[in-house]
Design a protein with these regions (language model features):
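A mid-sequence, solvent-exposed acidic-amphipathic segment
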Residues: 144-205, 212
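A short, polar/proline- and glycine-enriched secondary-structure boundary/capping micro-motif
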Residues: 50-52, 94, 182-185, 267
Length: 267
């Protein structure tokens, strides 16, 4: 569990007291591709190889595990570094992409400095899937997400990304200070295990940003469920790329924002 115990001062009922609290860790992860710095992301330490693999997939650097010749972590006192070596063929295919290195990701925004939706659309193919899930079961996945969030229970500061199969069986759950990092870690874990094709549903503890839609499309997952609502750009991108978006309604139920055909009511 990546937290650090810290003593804080609590002010309640006109009085003060000291209390120990678990604070979520946040550190930089440098991702090097072909021996050159490519990205620095601020994240919760842990699952570095899965994180880097998922980042490379969802950012378009790789399409298959076989595109990666070597994936290795190097830990030092000051930072964490993961090096990614691609096959010569893949390196040549994405030479222009590699020239855009210098991606800096903050925990609140994984697309800092990136171009907007029109450029994103040029590099993505719509998701084609006839998978359907029951409405009630989809809502239950959202309501039960906190059961898979030990970091959130201890720190109250992390996001979670959970991937489910077509029968809504959980495949992997990852937590991180950044919602996009949590998704990269979850996708990367299944990608390295060669099980990503089983994933049909993403469940997020956060709002749905267009970056999360982009990453989900790269992973070829047709459905996103989230506790909070999507942004307008996220909804636009999902509508155009065939991803179903739904979120938790209050006090119960679902808000279905686009492609509702994948949600069915069992009778």
């Amino acid at each position: 569990m990546s937290t650090t115990r810290h003593t804080i001062t609590v002010w309640q009922n006109a009085g003060q007291r000291a209390m120990a609290m678990d604070i979520l860790d946040e550190e930089p992860l440098a991702i090097r591709v072909q021996g050159q710095p490519y990205a620095v992301v601020m994240r919760t330490p842990g699952d570095e190889l899965a994180h880097a693999a998922g980042f490379c997939l969802t950012e378009g650097l790789v399409d298959r595990p076989e595109d990666i010749v070597n994936l290795a972590a190097c830990n030092t006192d000051d930072t964490n570094v993961v090096t990614v070596t691609l096959t010569p063929q893949r390196r040549d295919q994405i030479a222009g992409h590699l020239d855009r290195r210098g991606y800096i990701s903050q925990t609140s925004c994984g697309l800092c400095g990136k171009t907007l939706i029109d450029e994103v659309m040029q590099h993505l193919q719509p998701v084609q899937s006839d998978v359907t899930i029951p409405l009630a079961a989809a809502e239950q996945c959202l309501r039960n997400l906190d059961q898979f969030q030990p970091l959130r229970r201890s720190s109250a500061a992390s996001h979670a990304a959970a991937l489910f199969d077509a029968e809504l069986n959980p495949l992997v759950v990852m937590e991180d200070v950044g919602r996009h990092n949590a998704l990269d870690k979850a996708v990367g874990r299944l990608f390295l295990d060669r099980r990503l094709d089983l994933a049909k549903v993403v469940v997020m503890s956060s709002r749905i940003s267009y970056e999360l839609v982009q990453k989900t499309v790269r992973a070829r997952i047709p459905i996103i469920l989230a506790l909070s609502r999507p942004t307008r750009l996220a909804l636009d991108l999902a509508s155009r790329l065939g991803v179903s978006l739904a979120g938790a309604a209050k006090p119960a139920g679902l808000y279905i924002y686009c492609h509702p055909q994948r949600f069915v009511e069992l009778r």
